Amino acid sequence: MEEIQRYLQLERSQQHDFLYPLIFQEYIYAFAHDRDFNRSILSENPGYDNKSSLLIVKRLITRMYQQNHFLISPNDSNQNTFLASKNDLRIQIISEGFAFIVEIPFSLRLISCLEGKKKKIVKSQNLRSIHSIFPFLEDHFSHLNFVLDILIPHPVHVEILVQTLRYWVKDASSLHLLRFFLNEYCNWNSLITPKKASSSFSKRNQRLFLFLYNSHVYEYESIFGFLRNQSSHLRSTSSGVLRERIHFYGKIERLVNVFVKVKDFQANLWLVKEPCMHYIRYQRKSILASKGTSLFMNKWKCYLVTFWQWHFSLWFHPRRIYINQLSNHSLEFLGYLSSVRMNPSVVRSQILENSFLINNAIKRVDTLVPIIPLIASLAKAKFCNVLGHPISKPVRADLSDSNIIDRFGRICRNLSHYHSGSSKKKSLYRIKYILRLSCARTLARKHKSTVRTFLKRLGSELLEEFLMSEEDVLFLTFPKVSSTLQGVYRSRIWYLDIISINDLANHKSKF
């Protein structure tokens, strides 16, 4: 972001919020390309096309300067060559530039906030992160009873997303151009349904839509977060917070008058007074958990559905919201199957001559790797069949053996790294076995040999070197403390460099 600040004239851009000229700047597309390329190497397989170049960007900007291709006219819209030839690469470049430009006001606002208040960093900014979910699973999940498993629907039209962005971006020209681009070049069904997505709006281009979608979801989450955060102090008996509680009840009454026009909402106002509510979300999946009863969760379900449908045009289907009891059901979230299990422990006590046994049941959170969906993802990516038997992948003839092994090893290490928070690692061993044998069969297929002959000729150590997990590397580096580290790695470890869900955990993969 520092490099962008050197290019931008911050005095003018921050004063007028004028983003439209940035669309015609070459460095914007260069920054957008480099950012997506670097992130794809960290978390995905290297499959980024090398067709994009500054020469193509210059030609695209020149065409945008020479002719008014984005001008809508009912008479000549069909004759517009820029609209008629929906070039995949051109659409990809423009969408990457749009995604980068609309994020600039948010990034600059965050930087100015942190620079002006270095001592007072807003906690809500830190909590709105994927890293806040892992402590929630560790610390609070075992103390809850019921969860609302909610699949947030997409808005019915792209115009709703653009209207939401108007509160943050004051440049009308950029918004009009963004609206026109989304309506003309991007199929709305392909945006909201990944299975229908064409090559013209690939996974990298989904960043623009995800940014608009998260901005829309943030609007109603901010109101819900206010009720949740303030209600956590309602049961305090200290006289110092009595005035704050009185003001909070007044704010709730105003929210009822401003945001909610439901007749029976006044009678259900006590819903927001429950302090034991927890809300987490990642992408479209959100969870509302509480210590309350099933009746209490049903009332929250009715309230939230009515609230979202009336004021944010989010139409929920009843089958998209589930009320599950944690002791009987597993929760699928972030590529894990999380559940609360009773772990019995027997303690022998003795008082004088009498001895007796005490049975204690302690709640424990289990985070398991969903092996069946993960194998289905591997089968979809052609690493194995539907039964989990490894198969060879067709690869290009110009790829070297080390390049093939490195690609398989990257997938294996990413899966081990992401699912290190699993309480049971046996499922990961099966995934590693599938990837290792699939890699061996792919190499044997390339050399027109059998797996046994290939491994006998090159040695199995070649595969072990590239497919070694992080735990194995640590044990080899520090052999004297390996016994201690083995006990550590049997427990859950959440790595802080996990910034997005793994593709295979998301049931999507490309090689």
From Swiss-Prot:
One Pfam family named in its UniProt record = Intron_maturas2
Q: Is Transferase among the key words of this record?
A: no
Q: Molecular function (GO) terms listed?
A: RNA binding
Disulphide bond pairs: none
| Chloroplast in keyword set | yes
**Cell location:** Plastid, Chloroplast
> Cellular component terms, GO, for this chain's entry?
chloroplast
BP-aspect Gene Ontology terms: mRNA processing; RNA splicing; tRNA processing
- Keywords on record: Chloroplast, mRNA processing, Plastid, RNA-binding, tRNA processing
Function statement:
Usually encoded in the trnK tRNA gene intron. Probably assists in splicing its own and other chloroplast group II introns.
Which protein family is named in the record?
Belongs to the intron maturase 2 family. MatK subfamily.
- Name under which the protein is recorded: Maturase K
State the organism named in the record.
Diplacus aurantiacus (Orange bush monkey flower)
Q: Source organism lineage?
A: Eukaryota, Viridiplantae, Streptophyta, Embryophyta, Tracheophyta
